[in-house]
Amino acid sequence: MNKARYTQDVPEDRIKLLESIASYNKPFTLMVVGGVDSGKSTLITFLGNELLSLGFKVAVVDSDVGQKGVLPPGTISLAIPEGPFESMSELEGVAHYFVGTTAPSQFIGEMAVGVKRMVEIARNVADVVLIDTTGFVTGVGAEMKRLKAELVKPDIIAVIHSGELSGLVKALEPYGGVIELAVSETVKRYPLEERRNLRAEKWRNYFRDSQLVEFSASEVAITGTSLFHGIPLNADENELLEKAFGWLVVAGWKNKGYTVVKADVEKFPRAHSRELKAIDFEKLSNLLVGLIDGEGLCMGVGVLKWINFSEGRLQILTPVRDLSGVREIRFGRIRVTEEGEELGLLRRDEL
């Protein structure tokens, strides 16, 4: 199933926007902002197809990490369509930036930087860059949109709303020409369960031809987590922590504070101070990770299946075949199986 399929039944204000883009100096950048189910992806699909038909080279930056059209979820992706497309899910990404979650409220830095990186690449190869964004537009979400606009400075920011985003419109005005579009009467609403099913289908499609691969923590950087950072704890230190807190300590490191991977042994384990970060071993299972190259871009994502802490080796399920460019394994904050079942989100400070 495809979300936001292209339709020729287009409101007049979209036609006027298309005409404005076609007449602008190139390269041109458009950022589309709007709430959930406001028609952002449909607008980008319409504009992309029409601009292609006019002979322009088009780039699409998909930063809707929770409802990605361009695989994989949990990343910001750049696609360069070569011909007509009915939905963004038909597009193949040529570059990605790892965010590592489908709920980016704690990752506004990664979201803003990721869009900036993709737009920088796109402006070098395309006449028109179209940026799709999440439907997260209040509170932290509004700040995220402002940061993206401030970094990218789009030529036009199209805000799709029915009056509820007037405050955000004012906040975006210093960073680009803002135009307001009405929410189309034909826009489709997607219930939460249907959104989950759509995302599960995308996870399954992405991981369909995956294989289990292994990385050494001594050969690649481990980021997005406190694991493997610091001096490993010795047996006496592990035993002391186990007795003090009722844990089975799987691994641990000391830096300014302590980081331990543990499993609870006692039914009611004791509390600990902030200087001690305790990571539940089970929360590492099926964790989404990014395979990062030497330029900080994401070559693809994988599912963490096992860590051999004594040998410092990580087993990851991924469809990425050529691993020679991987320089970093970056931990995300969503647990998901290769069958598409989402096992839960983690807070940023949990790892």
Swiss-Prot record:
It catalyses: a 5'-end dephospho-2'-deoxyribonucleoside-DNA + ATP = a 5'-end 5'-phospho-2'-deoxyribonucleoside-DNA + ADP + H(+); a 5'-end dephospho-ribonucleoside-RNA + ATP = a 5'-end 5'-phospho-ribonucleoside-RNA + ADP + H(+). Its cofactor is a divalent metal cation. Signal peptide: none annotated. The keyword Repressor does not apply. InterPro entries: Clp1/Grc3, CLP1_P, P-loop_NTPase. Keywords: ATP-binding, Kinase, Nucleotide-binding, Transferase. Its EC number is 2.7.1.78. It holds the Pfam family CLP1_P. It comes from the Archaea. ATP binds at G34, G35, V36, D37, S38, G39, K40, S41. GO terms for molecular function: ATP binding; ATP-dependent polydeoxyribonucleotide 5'-hydroxyl-kinase activity; ATP-dependent polyribonucleotide 5'-hydroxyl-kinase activity; polynucleotide 5'-hydroxyl-kinase activity. One of its GO terms (biological process) is RNA processing. Polynucleotide kinase that can phosphorylate the 5'-hydroxyl groups of both single-stranded RNA (ssRNA) and single-stranded DNA (ssDNA). Exhibits a strong preference for ssRNA. This is Polyribonucleotide 5'-hydroxyl-kinase TK1956. The lineage of its organism: Archaea, Methanobacteriati, Methanobacteriota, Thermococci, Thermococcales.
